Amino acid sequence: MNIVVLAGGTSTERDISILTSTKVCESLRRNGHNANIIDVFFGIEDKEAESFFTNNNDVEKTAEAMRKNTVNVEDELEARKKSGKGFFGDNVLALCSKADIVFMGLHGSNGEDGKIQAAFELMGIKYTGTDYISSAISKIGRAHV
């Protein structure tokens, strides 16, 4: 299967998401899948996107590059608000659309509140985990406990 492992994001749990997603991606590969990790917020360049499912890159190196981007999250959020670029990084939605399934390795806001799941459902993208309504209700319920 061609699997996108979605990681990173903008929450304070970004680093945990990257760690989790790295381990998941490595495990999926050991089990014969074409899996690759991508940062939902920063995405990847066009040249990398072309070979995304056939490139058996070093997952740990990719994760390290994602961790280095962590210092830029706040600045990038501000820049995107001004430019209207939106949340998803370059090539993220295109690659998720081409995947057989997306593994949701996101933690914290956006990954657990149903927003990304809702976008995926609108686009017909298959993903792991609960649907957007269940995610949203769960997030709201935890806030009141």
Predicted ranges, named:
Residues 1-143:
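ATP-binding N-terminal substructure of ATP-dependent carboxylate-amine bond-forming enzymes
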